[in-house]
Amino acid sequence: MASKVISATIRRTLTKPHGTFSRCRYLSTAAAATEVNYEDESIMMKGVRISGRPLYLDMQATTPIDPRVFDAMNASQIHEYGNPHSRTHLYGWEAENAVENARNQVAKLIEASPKEIVFVSGATEANNMAVKGVMHFYKDTKKHVITTQTEHKCVLDSCRHLQQEGFEVTYLPVKTDGLVDLEMLREAIRPDTGLVSIMAVNNEIGVVQPMEEIGMICKEHNVPFHTDAAQAIGKIPVDVKKWNVALMSMSAHKIYGPKGVGALYVRRRPRIRLEPLMNGGGQERGLRSGTGATQQIVGFGAACELAMKEMEYDEKWIKGLQERLLNGVREKLDGVVVNGSMDSRYVGNLNLSFAYVEGESLLMGLKEVAVSSGSACTSASLEPSYVLRALGVDEDMAHTSIRFGIGRFTTKEEIDKAVELTVKQVEKLREMSPLYEMVKEGIDIKNIQWSQH
Amino acid sequence: MVSSSEVLSLCRALLRAGRQFPDYNIREYSKRRTLDGFRMNKNLTDPSKVTEAYAEAKKQLFVAERVLKVYLAYPPKTKNIMEVKLQ
């Protein structure tokens, strides 16, 4: 009996406090979880503490992979491991089918024939191949290339390389809205012009060039027209026949596909010929030797098909967000300038300059928003973007530019947050800025003669 | 002809799958895309069109369920800033 009582009390004392204790602990962990989590979630990287993964607004640099593309790649990854150029067994045939299917999907997006698509490693390779390849092939008769000052680095650098080899290059200036002056282009064309290379959508300012008109001018003068459409395909309607392009560079990772794959459209009729960069097994019509990256290519194909299906839906959504972002910032801040034409612009790009603010401080303060000051290749340096300088943007304004890239997966809440953080940061920096104070007092800072000590 | 209850349950299944993605952006997108997709086809009357749309959505459900397993196996190490502030 006594033992029964003792055991009962023991049980009671053990269970009861234990019960309350555990409930208490549960509550405390739940309460702590939100706080502790907050601490745990924060990331320490490169000396910066961020309280979570920043919201991603850098869709011109690259895009996250779409789960539907991921699924298509997964399926291919497991069994289609054959070399697509193996002609003697099923493994090769399967892989070849997968690649050809992707080729059809890419071709359909740009209204081309599948035979005109050459898979390469990305838009940089495609641009190099187009610019150098065509000029090298026609080097006996053609000595001149025309491009613009706002091209991507890989086109400009290829042109510089050609210059060292003795070719002549004309870098066309652009108007203040970022568009090419068609009359200037017409005048720049010479009898020995071998290539005109103008990008469709600018990576920094999102300006859409008048492709059809440029194509017409090139056709009139019988000059091959190359365009870098890495930022254009899947985002704006692309038709190689209407644009009259001879060569077009494309990339998968700008349209929610995998990195490391792209394509070059090489027109068949009238035929354009180019010297390959890679020599070897003669894959891809001898233009790009090397085993095709089957899975990447499958992903590229899937991304193209998806982009075609979703273009209208995505554009509507992205346009709404772009307006929301611009209106949100403009509502609260003065001295905000949109760089590049607003009428002829891809909706997912918004390149803004904030007057009287130091660009790097602004970017450093905006650690919770993943944006960049320009293209990824130039944002590491303190130099202002050469694209903005080509537009004639003042040095101080070019220094404070931020490129917001909006995409398929961006949410309204993210845009609101980005507006809130940007406004807060700009206001904070302006409060410290003596320049802004002077402007408020009505002093025109452009006319100040700064004395040097 | 697909019944409306079948359509509704498919919509719900897609929403359920989408809700489980550990990635903030994909979760939000799949919700928006599912709802908009079903809303867009709300007024379809042609039986063949309805069947087609139903089959398409069914395909999307299979894709979502397949990739979800992989996404759940590799959750992001840190939460998105949008989720941190919501807590």
Curated annotation (Swiss-Prot), chain A:
Threefold increase in the catalytic activity in the presence of FH (frataxin). 30-fold increase in the catalytic activity in the presence of SUFE1. The keyword Iron-sulfur applies. Its main location: mitochondrion. Transmembrane segments: none annotated. GO terms for molecular function: ATP binding; cysteine desulfurase activity; iron-sulfur cluster binding; pyridoxal phosphate binding; zinc ion binding. Disruption phenotype: Lethal when homozygous. [2Fe-2S] cluster binds at residue 377. One of its GO terms (cellular component) is mitochondrion. Belongs to the class-V pyridoxal-phosphate-dependent aminotransferase family. NifS/IscS subfamily. Catalyzes the removal of elemental sulfur from cysteine to produce alanine. Supplies the inorganic sulfur for iron-sulfur (Fe-S) clusters. Interacts with FH. Interacts with SUFE1. NCBIfam families: IscS, PRK14012.1. This is Cysteine desulfurase, mitochondrial. The gene is NIFS1.
